[in-house]
Amino acid sequence: AVERSGGHGFIGLGRKRFLQLLHARARELGVNLHFESEFDVSDIDTRFADADLVVASDGLNSRVRNAFPDVFRSTTEIRPNKFVWLGTHQTFSDAFTFIFEKTSAGWIWAHAYQFDANTSTFIVETTPEVYDALGFEHMSHEQSAETCRQIFEAYLDGHSLMTNSAHIRGSAWINFPAVYCDNWIKDDRVVLIGDAAHTAHFSIGSGTKLGLEDAISLAKHLDSDLSIPAALRAYQDERKVEVLRLQNSARNAMIWFEHVPRYIEAFDLKQFNYSMLTRSQRVSHENLRLRDPEWLESMEQHLTERYLGNDGERAVPPMFLPFKLRNMPLVN
């Protein structure tokens, strides 16, 4: 069965093209770009000892953050679900697409979205139990991609699934690391931005956005009349509030996907899709009405008929419907 809901804004851009644009702009501004240069944390006090500022944007496995856990007061929480980042030339051009498939071992699902004219990202996620049962741990990267292609064949229109993780040893599948830092600044001259400072689960698609907004905020404060130490503190104070808000939403969405088998088995299609659309709690019932009033009205009508049996009557908001606890109906 297919359900569609509109009104949800989305922008996709290929990572390669994105980096090309950033490189071109940096050169335009006179920045010296160095590639294939190994970096060690000790370089901060040796090679870069005369630098006024070192910006550590070295990602979720940040060497800088990991070298000073007591300074950055960082925690990394490894979540249980397994996922693998794949690509395909099936474009999914009309919408951000979620696909749920039940295998002999249990449920597995995909997050798919287009990022250029002929390519889409295709993230496959599942529970650790299904991951183990399907034998992904013992597969090569290519075998994993082919197994996923077979599972989702009905949605790929003959296209293959591509892997870009040859640099990863062992399984291409990973667990999501939820990174939190209480402090982003060291010695008033080293600062974390992006995934080095915080991560947000891929299901809300805000990781790159957060990193860019960090950079914009940092540049704004450095370009002000503030000293570098004061500018770094202003940047951290400003960004931590917004990052925490999005991390909370991402955490809600992440935990929802960790319980997909429970929801998909217990809910009917409309109720399951409503639960998925509101999973982050950024999208409330009434916010969903603003985004897609037709879909929400159909869902309210569906629940009204299911719980009250008044086919054709005006839909009742879900909060006013009766609730059944085992065999005991609770009249609202």
Where are these regions (language model features)?
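Conserved N-terminal helical subregion
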Residues: A1-W85, L296-M299, T304-A315, M319-M328
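A short, flexible beta-alpha/helix-coil linker loop
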Residues: V2-E3, P128-Y131, A197-T199
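Short acidic, glycine/proline-rich loop/turn micro-motifs
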Residues: S5-G7, D132-F136, S203-G205
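Short, conserved loop/turn and helix-capping segments at secondary-structure boundaries
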Residues: K16, H138-E142, G205-E213
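Alpha-helical elements of Rossmann-like donor-binding domains used by nucleotide-donor carbohydrate transfer enzymes
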Residues: L21, E38, R63, T147, ...
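Conserved FAD-binding catalytic core of PHBH/FMO-like flavoproteins
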Residues: A24, F48-F176, Y180, I185
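Conserved mid-domain beta->alpha element of the FAD-binding
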Residues: V55-A56, L86, A172-N252, W256-E258
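C-terminal helical "tail/cap" subdomain of flavin- and related membrane-associated enzymes
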Residues: K220-N332
